[in-house]
From Swiss-Prot:
Alphabetized UniProt keyword annotations: Autocatalytic cleavage, Disulfide bond, Glycoprotein, Hydrolase, Lysosome, Protease
EC number(s) recorded for this UniProt protein: 3.5.1.26
Location in the cell: Lysosome
GO biological process, alphabetically ordered: proteolysis
PANTHER family noted in UniProt: L-ASPARAGINASE, N(4)-(BETA-N-ACETYLGLUCOSAMINYL)-L-ASPARAGINASE
Organism encoding this protein: Spodoptera frugiperda (Fall armyworm)
Glycosylation site positions: 15
Disulphide bridges: 41-46, 141-157, 295-320
Protein name per Swiss-Prot or TrEMBL: N(4)-(Beta-N-acetylglucosaminyl)-L-asparaginase
Family: Belongs to the Ntn-hydrolase family.
Catalytic activity: N(4)-(beta-N-acetyl-D-glucosaminyl)-L-asparagine + H2O = N-acetyl-beta-D-glucosaminylamine + L-aspartate + H(+)
Quaternary organization: Heterotetramer of two alpha and two beta chains or heterodimer of an alpha and a beta chain.
Role: Cleaves the GlcNAc-Asn bond which joins oligosaccharides to the peptide of asparagine-linked glycoproteins.
Single annotated GO MF: peptidase activity
Length: 320
């Protein structure tokens, strides 16, 4: 039984889901739905972890990572460490549609965006400046992502230098994802034609080291889509999760016959075998419109589903 069109979205980002659904229910394209949904979160600054004015880096700057994938062509567009451009997922789509590349990063991705007609503007807000200044001056740069450097990053701000001799201590988990700090929007859609698309958008980890790129823009990590199978998206501690390509793994598990929920579980277990306490979740959607999710390191994980069988969106919450 085919259930399409359908869109699933990480966390309780219902406005983004509704926007994507508006595109899909009128026979629109999955790719457009994912981009439009992402734009909503970038503009609404979903939980301050998507879009401008959130998650300042060590220097106080907000930079964006985004990704979009077309499961009908296997084409990808991605941007990382994007500076001074609000609409990261749209820039990612421009990389896909106006270049033969897949991925642009940093200052020169900004140059490309400006050439493509995007407006350059500061991504900082009063709120992000205040958050940063508290971290820098009241909290002595705690928490941060440094290790094996001097001065001791657990007590002091930089500039840091590497320690000559060090014992690699277990760094406390800095990246806390909970219902107040959702770190990424991830979205997977199947349209009425059966085309699959997936995408992500995020401003990354709060107080990240400048230049840090998370899992969101990495194909197969943040999201993945393949018309012959379905799609998946991931959210959580990107530094850890990207090493396991969970979205790719979930799609491959579905290819081998696993249900979306079991496929997501396998992807999560592959990570938790090495990092039992990592925080994250994977959502998966088959080309026929079956869906499921799995999570780790938080108590529960909500995701949004919208399809023809529902009058409005439904927030489905699973236990981790």
């Amino acid at each position: 039984e085919k259930n399409m069109p359908i869109v699933i979205t990480t966390w309780s980002f219902t406005n983004a889901s509704q926007k994507a659904w508006e595109v899909l229910k009128d026979e629109g394209k999955a790719l457009d739905a994912v981009e439009q949904g992402g734009i909503v979160c970038e503009n609404e600054q979903c939980d301050r972890t998507v879009g401008y004015g959130g998650s300042p880096d060590e220097d106080g700057e907000t930079t964006l990572d985004a990704f979009i994938m077309d499961g009908s062509t296997m084409n990808v567009g991605a941007v990382a460490a994007l500076r001074r451009i609000k609409s990261a997922i749209s820039v990612a789509r421009h990389v896909m549609e106006y270049t033969t590349h897949s991925f642009l990063a940093g200052e020169l991705a900004t140059k490309f965006a400006v050439e493509m007609g995007f407006k350059e503007e500061s991504l900082s807000t009063d709120e992000s400046r205040e958050l940063w200044s508290k971290w820098r001056f009241e909290k002595q740069c705690q928490p941060n992502f440094r290790k094996n450097v001097k001065p001791d990053p657990r007590k002091h701000c930089g500039p840091y230098h590497k320690k000559r001799n060090f014992v690699d201590y277990i760094h406390p988990e800095v990246f806390v994802v909970d219902q107040y700090n959702h770190d990424t929007i991830g979205m997977v859609a199947v349209d009425s034609k059966g085309d699959v698309a997936a995408g992500t958008s995020t401003n990354g980890a709060k107080f990240k080291i400048p230049g840090r790129v998370g899992d969101s823009p990495i194909p197969g990590a943040g999201a993945y889509a393949d018309n012959t199978v379905g799609g998946a998206a991931a959210t959580g501690n990107g530094d850890t999760m990207m090493r396991f390509l969970p979205s790719f793994l979930a799609v491959e598990e579905m290819r081998r016959g696993a249900s979306p929920a079991n496929a997501a579980k396998t992807a999560i277990k592959r990570i938790s075998a090495h990092h039992p306490d990592f925080m994250g979740a994977v959502i998966a959607l088959s080309k026929n419109g079956q869906y499921g999710a799995a999570c780790n390191g938080i108590e529960t994980f909500p995701f949004v589903v919208q399809d023809k069988t529902r009058k409005t969106f439904e927030v489905v919450t699973i236990k981790c």
